[in-house]
Amino acid sequence: GANTAVGAASRGARAGFIGKVRDDELGRIYRHDMNATGVRFETAYADPDGPATARSFILVTPDGERTMNTYLGACQNLSPADIDEATVRGAKITYLEGYLWDPPAAKEAFRKAVEIAHAAGNRVALTLSDSFCVDRYRTEFLDLARTGAIDILFANIHELKALYETADEDTAVAALREEGHPQRDFLAVITRSERGSLIVSRAGTHAVSAFPVETLVDLTGAGDLFAGG
């Protein structure tokens, strides 16, 4: 979510971030750098006796692919009390991060944000985050779409296949076209690496070609920045 907010801000959008860091060295750097990029980040620090600020050790292979070893730490302490109503009401799109669908309090925070956003006539987006996250919460993620809690879904093709438990791309895309609440518009954006992306709705599927790149250096955050515009 943070990378996506930074990406949107770098393109001139007004962006804010709601998330938890602790008042430790990494947390203070994170808060400073987010605000310095133009992303409004004012969520209160996490409990000083709780977990440290999240961090990730990332291994990048010569082909640009990455393996992430992540400690979620303080970010899992997000609660409904952290959801700033004015921030959510003022956002045309509230972007939810699937990684944080683990703790019960964070789920309640998500639901509060959805209620505020929809009451203000705004839209809610969800990113599936990774295939392991999808495997843990497949039913709940699908329920969010089918009950109208989310209006926009972001995923890569591996996450989409995991969502529908199929190895066949066409089968997964066909199932996705049927998703969403019947009384709300639903849109999905699926990335497919060098094959570009798919825009999927009940009206059909539109393929968008990828921009050709001679040398891939590091794919870390590529999907996040794609979602940021």
Task: Give, region by region, the residue ranges found by the protein language model.
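Hydrophobic beta-strand scaffold residues
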Residues: A15, F41, V124-A125, A188
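Structural recognition of alpha->loop->beta junctions
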Residues: G38-R40, R138-A162
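Conserved N-terminal subdomain of the carbohydrate kinase-like
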Residues: S10-L96
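Active-site beta-loop-alpha junctions enriched in small/polar residues
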Residues: Y99, S129-S131, H158-L160, S193
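Distinct, well-ordered alpha-helical segments
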Residues: D82, E108, V134-R146
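Conserved phosphate-binding/catalytic region of the ribokinase-like
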Residues: E115-A119, T139, E165-G229
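Anion (oxyanion) recognition and catalysis
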Residues: A9, N35, E115-A119
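Active-site alpha-helical elements of protease catalytic centers
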Residues: G1-I18, G228
